[in-house]
Amino acid sequence: MSPPDPQQRRIGILGGTFNPVHHGHLIMAEQALWQFNLDQVLWMPAGDPPHKPLAAGASKADRLAMVKLAIADHERFACSDLEIRRPGPSYTIETLRSLMQEQPDTQWYWIIGVDALRDLPQWYQAEELARLCHWIVAPRIDAGDAAQVLRSVAAKLPIRAAILDAPTLTLSSTYLRQQIQKGGSIRYLVPPAVEHYIRQHRLYLDP
């Protein structure tokens, strides 16, 4: 990555469906915040993700509310409803352009899991998107070697990226939804406020 401009704020964007948000997301955001000296991590729940179908069980409003609950006690985490409000597919490049227009004196870092990074060359306007920001790649134990995936993507796109040094968890939103559907426990897998919201609103009970 190029040297940071000391005059610019450094904001990381963590996008995802957060269906539901869990401690793996929080660990990723916290480690990115400190390892890359970010001023803030902006959480960006997807409205209608174009690259994968959105699993049922929670509305856009529910997913947004759960993220807000999960990060409520962190002074350097913030949540945006930009993609939730915007009609149509939630294209990352449109989100990034909007943020850059609103805050032109900011250096942007997109936090992405290695599983999503593998598909980045197929994303909408991928080449321009790769150029617009820095990329922080979070490893996953079930998604292959992060360095190898990054080399493969860098051969196709002009990407400036670094790999996050963080625990490689297998925890996923899919697993949590399955646990809830079969009446299992999600205690310690999500923040208590998120678990309470899920139980109170009876989310993810139907397969």
Swiss-Prot record:
Keyword NAD on entry: yes
Pathway where this protein functions: Cofactor biosynthesis; NAD(+) biosynthesis; deamido-NAD(+) from nicotinate D-ribonucleotide: step 1/1
Top-rank taxon, per record: Bacteria
Catalytic activity: nicotinate beta-D-ribonucleotide + ATP + H(+) = deamido-NAD(+) + diphosphate
Keyword vocabulary terms for this entry: ATP-binding, NAD, Nucleotide-binding, Nucleotidyltransferase, Pyridine nucleotide biosynthesis, Transferase
EC code(s) of this entry: 2.7.7.18
GO terms classed as biological process: NAD biosynthetic process
GO molecular function: ATP binding; nicotinate-nucleotide adenylyltransferase activity
Role description: Catalyzes the reversible adenylation of nicotinate mononucleotide (NaMN) to nicotinic acid adenine dinucleotide (NaAD).
Annotated PANTHER family: NICOTINATE-NUCLEOTIDE ADENYLYLTRANSFERASE-RELATED, PHOSPHOPANTETHEINE ADENYLYLTRANSFERASE
UniProt similarity note: Belongs to the NadD family.
Name of protein: Probable nicotinate-nucleotide adenylyltransferase
Source organism of the structure: Synechococcus sp. (strain JA-3-3Ab)
Originating gene: nadD
